[in-house]
Amino acid sequence: MADIEDYAAFCHKFGDQVDAYANMDVIGDAAATYENQCVMEDLGLHPLPVFHRGDDWKYLDDYLKGDHDYIAFGGVADPRDRKAANKWMGKVISHIVEFNPTIKTHAFGVTSPEELVKYRFFSCDSSTWCDAFRYNKYQFYKGHGVLEEIDVQESRKRIGLHYGSVPLDGKFKHSLTTWKKRMEFIDRIIPSSEQPFRKAEIDQLSV
């Protein structure tokens, strides 16, 4: 497992090749996550601070009061309790908008059109697009941001091809193309992260 110095060295080497990189978070330990943030900044790096559901809110306030215009959030995509995760995220966004509405937000593990539109994340990431070749599930894009997933046996009936026989690189390309179409649709419908929230929208964030 990489330690913070190894990760910092990696970011120094490749950081200029990406749009952004996040702090090395320690899930369940907000203090250790904050310490890693400080270490990386002391080394001349500018990682996105990471705030997780369950962390003490004082850490979010510390990040907001610091020189950070872009913050990442974890715990948003909790399939065990989606309602609670969404309520928490709504409170977070409301808090940020009140403090500084120009701060950009990144969501770990989120690709739901509804959540991306509601919270206006500036960016997001997810490994769900890999499910097709990780679990042999054929995904195809139905339009309007909707994906349908079918199992290997059903794929022969639906597409005339047993998906299990498709080479890995073929599954990779298909999944990449499918998810690209989905995200292009979401990009078209999501409000700009620079567009101010109306009061009625803020009131609905935690609902």
Where are these regions (language model features)?
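Catalytic beta/alpha-barrel core
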Residues: 1-6, 10, 17-62, 68-85, ...
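Alpha/beta catalytic cores of nucleotide-metabolism and tRNA/nucleoside-modifying enzymes
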Residues: 2-15, 22-25, 31-41, 90-105, ...
